[in-house]
UniProtKB/Swiss-Prot annotation:
It is found in: Cytoplasm. NCBIfam families: PRK00558.1-5, uvrC. Keywords: Cytoplasm, DNA damage, DNA excision, DNA repair, Excision nuclease, SOS response. This is UvrABC system protein C. Residues 31-109 form the GIY-YIG domain. GO terms for biological process: nucleotide-excision repair; SOS response. It holds the Pfam family HHH_5. PROSITE patterns: GIY_YIG, UVR, UVRC. It comes from Colwellia psychrerythraea (strain 34H / ATCC BAA-681) (Vibrio psychroerythus). Its main location: cytoplasm. InterPro entries: GIY-YIG_endonuc (IPR000305), GIY-YIG_endonuc_sf (IPR035901), GIY-YIG_UvrC_Cho (IPR047296), Hlx-hairpin-Hlx_DNA-bd_motif (IPR003583), RuvA_2-like (IPR010994), UVR_dom (IPR001943), UVR_dom_sf (IPR036876), UvrABC_protein_C (IPR050066).
């Protein structure tokens, strides 16, 4: 049966059958350009491809002389094919990339690390804010980056504060100011919130900051020198001194920056592969120096060529069909991408990247001089990263094997989850759920739960809450939990950080699920001195106690998982506690309602300023009497 749907953008055609009839499909499939998705009998997308002529490309899969083993295996699993017609080949390339990201088909080259890079963002505000941004570019403003790490962004922000007095505070803090904050006193902000600088002068500093972030520090100095001379000629000596200080700081920065050569802005893509794995190492060259680097380990079908891998990486890493309606990105795509060999669609990819970046983007292969050296360095780093990863993986796999020797699970151990509870005197309770597989921590599957609706301090109830959050969906389909998706997959082992009571609560919970396969539940009890190496494992059911030698790889794995669970829980708890404490200090004072609390924060400029204020300053706040000011001061200083 042929199903057609048409809208203004694309045209979909689908044939579905228990046994795929390729002849019937090829008789009706279009010859236009587009993207095709192949499904198996479970309606799972197993491959996504694109073609200038869909009919011709799809017919090639069903010839008798298909040479590729991968293609032969793929064709045997096809139960349905869906095609999407596009207007151009470039549109097909973008759509293919997005479908691959969405469906993660097992026969495609997959770049699984889709974590967004951090950017510096200058917001589109009357008084723009300079700050770190990560995630979708939904905030209006100009984005500068990407940066390889968050640390690199913070380093840049600290540097920017020394040169340009642009605010870095949140808009809510900015709106609440009635007097300059500490950053203004330190010379790091011009206090636009309280009109210490005109809109035009602030805009001037913002524009200079943008030039600096574009790598044009010499142009910034030229403008500052001109303005310093103008201010001096007009006898505005204080303003001239400020420009002079900016120039001095900028010159120091220029001297400190190591210029590695004549290459200003490019990404260098290194590749190394062994028999089963591939590593791609990306070097970021910005403002004539190596800004940072990152390694990727894509999932690659065994017969894929280096050229195919590089093309898939460039498409998945750089291309996006999400046109930025709110923000303008500066340098998110470099002006040049260097790779070690040519790729089939180099012209089309370069055109699409140029269109997306709004400037010319070049993809270079035959490189010499500095670019060749960078490419060699990227390849060396890819090799090193793969060797390091394999060493870590071998160590982790050995620990999994050692742990299975302890528990003797028939099908081995593939996935382990661990739960921990963190709170302070029963308040701000947070539960963590960390996941490990044979490659180590699976951080994309980590979950943290804010626990509520229980008696404060009841760790057993908190554990039941967390288990229900994690596995509660399985109650709807206890027969086949694996059909709930990756995040609902049952682990082979569930570690419970705690003693017999916590373990009993977990046993009670899982007994209610009536699953066809229940994970092995194990309590991890700390020794009397709580020193590492003295942990005792408690098996569910028999509650048998197992103590492993301090040198045991199995124990090291348990400690690693337990420590990671504890770290993840306590990090969340501390953040929650800090957030609550900021509010609770004033809320706990009798006679201070919402209006007076807001008056204090707005008039004085925030909680820190309220705590630092003396009784006289507190009494100046509208609605706060001298008696109440004294009461507030005493409460905040525990008198």
């Amino acid at each position: 049966m042929l199903h057609n749907t048409t809208d203004n953008v694309e045209n979909n055609q689908t044939i579905k059958a228990s046994t795929f009839d390729s002849e019937a499909f090829l008789r009706v499939v279009t010859e236009q350009a587009g993207v095709y998705r192949m499904y198996d009998s479970k309606q799972v997308v197993i491959y996504v491809g694109k073609a200038k002529q869909l009919k011709k490309r799809l017919a090639s899969y069903f010839r008798k002389d298909v040479g590729s083993v991968k293609t032969q295996v793929l064709v045997k699993q096809i139960a349905a094919i869906e095609v999407t017609v596009t207007h151009t080949e470039g549109e097909a390339l973008i759509l293919e990339n997005n479908y691959i990201k969405k469906y993660q088909p097992k026969y495609n080259i997959l770049l699984r690390d889709d974590k967004s890079y951090p950017y510096l963002l200058i917001t589109a505000h009357k008084h723009p804010k300079l700050g770190l941004h990560r995630g979708g570019k939904k905030v209006k403003g100009e984005y500068f980056g990407p940066f390889p790490t968050v640390g690199a962004v913070w380093e840049s922000l600290r540097l920017m504060q020394k040169i340009f007095p642009i605010r870095q505070c949140e808009d809510s803090y900015y709106r609440a100011r009635s007097r300059p904050c500490l950053q203004h006193q330190l010379g790091r902000c011009s206090a636009p919130c309280v009109d210490k600088i005109s809109v035009d002068d602030y805009k001037e500093q913002v524009n200079l900051a943008k030039l600096f972030l574009q790598g044009k520090s010499s142009a910034v100095i030229e403008q500052l020198v001109a303005r310093m001379e103008l201010a001096s000629n007009e006898l505005h000596f204080e303003l001239a001194a400020k420009y002079r200080d900016q120039i001095v700081t900028l010159r120091k920065v220029q001297q400190q920056q190591h210029v590695s050569g004549h290459v200003a802005e490019l990404d260098v893509v290194g590749l190394y592969r062994d028999k089963t794995q591939v590593c791609i190492h990306l070097l970021f060259i910005r403002q004539h120096k190596i800004l940072g680097s990152k390694s990727y380990f894509p999932t690659v079908p065994s017969e894929s060529s280096d050229s195919e891998i590089l093309q898939a990486f460039i498409a998945q890493h750089y291309l996006s069909n999400e046109m930025l309606s709110h923000g303008k990105v500066q340098s998110s795509i470099p002006k040049e991408i260097v790779i070690k060999e040519s790729i089939e669609q180099v012209v089309e990819l370069a055109r699409l990247l140029s269109e997306q970046a709004e400037y010319d983007v070049k993809i270079s292969t035959n490189t010499r001089s500095e670019r060749a050296q960078y490419l060699k360095l990227a390849g060396t780093n890819a090799h090193t990263a793969l060797v390091t990863r394999n060493s870590h993986k071998e160590s982790m796999q050995a620990r999994f094997v050692a742990l299975n020797e302890v528990f003797e699970l028939e099908n081995g151990i593939q996935r382990i989850e661990c739960f921990d509870i963190s709170h302070t005197m029963g308040q701000q309770t947070v539960a963590s759920n960390v996941v490990f597989n044979q490659e180590g921590p699976l951080k994309t599957d980590y979950r943290r739960y804010n626990v509520f609706g229980i008696t404060p301090g009841d760790d057993y109830a908190a554990m039941a809450f967390a288990l229900n959050k994690r596995y509660g969906k399985l109650k709807a389909n206890p027969i086949k939990p694996e059909e709930h998706g990756a995040l609902e997959k049952l682990p082979d082992i569930v570690f419970i950080d705690g003693g017999k009571g916590q373990l009993a609560k977990a046993e009670e919970f899982f007994s209610q699920l009536a699953l066809t396969r229940t994970p092995l539940l194990v309590g991890v009890a700390k020794g009397e001195s709580r020193k590492p190496g003295l942990e005792t494992l408690i098996l569910a059911g028999s509650h048998q106690l197992i103590s492993l030698p301090a040198t045991s790889p199995a124990l090291h794995l348990v400690q690693h998982i337990r420590d990671e669970s504890h770290r993840f829980a306590i990090t969340g708890h501390r953040a929650k506690r800090q957030k609550v404490s900021k509010k609770s200090r004033l809320e706990s004072i009798e006679g201070i309602g919402a209006k007076k609390r807001q008056s204090l924060l707005t008039f004085l400029g925030g909680l820190q300023e309220v705590m630092q204020a003396d009784i006289t300053a507190l009494a100046k706040v509208p609605g706060i009497s001298h008696v109440l000011a004294e009461k507030i001061h005493n409460a905040l200083h525990d008198k």
